């Protein structure tokens, strides 16, 4: 694959990042940063709105992002897709914590939209351990339609080092 060839040349391909990605692939420090719209079910319009909103200031947390974007062009499904694609990984919160707290966050967002005059404190998120590497790779496949960070075969290679001999070592 193209990604494997890039790795052979010591070029890292990074998943989309909520504060770095644009509408096109970018090269930075020998790394390729993927655009937001490679995420399944994230349109060019949604990606463009995220980038425009980010011009007012970087997103400082998932809740900061959700407050600024939810209900405009980003709904629960889009939030799930963005989380599963790992775009918030650089905001110091893991994907499982976000997914497991998402309904509570959305309730908070909808309540704060309805009650403008009252100050509503942000929800306190319950921490969860990050998904296993194999689960993250599955989520990556469902988010992009391809494996970006690793391929499941790599887990088997690492965990099941099998001694193999070349056919040249066998005599007839």
Regions found by a protein language model. Give the residues of each.
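Ligand-binding pocket segment of bilobal, Venus flytrap-like solute-binding proteins
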Residues: 1
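Sliding clamp-binding short linear motifs
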Residues: 4-171
């Amino acid at each position: 694959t193209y990604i494997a060839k890039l790795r052979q040349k010591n070029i890292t391909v990074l998943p989309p990042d909520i504060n770095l990605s644009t509408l096109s692939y970018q090269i930075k420090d020998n790394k390729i940063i993927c655009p937001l719209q490679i995420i399944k079910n994230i349109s060019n319009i949604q990606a463009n709105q995220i980038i425009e909103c980010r011009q007012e200031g970087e997103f400082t947390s998932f809740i900061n992002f959700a407050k600024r974007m939810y209900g405009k062009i980003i709904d629960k499904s889009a939030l799930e897709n963005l989380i599963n694609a790992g775009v918030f990984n650089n905001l110091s919160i893991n994907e499982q914590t976000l997914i497991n707290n998402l309904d509570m966050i959305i309730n908070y967002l909808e309540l704060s939209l309805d009650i403008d005059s009252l100050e509503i404190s942000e929800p306190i998120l319950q921490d969860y351990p990050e998904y296993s590497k194999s689960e993250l790779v599955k989520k990556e496949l469902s988010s992009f339609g391809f494996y970006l960070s690793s391929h499941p075969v790599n887990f088997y290679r690492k965990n099941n080092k099998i001694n193999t001999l070349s056919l040249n070592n066998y005599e007839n």
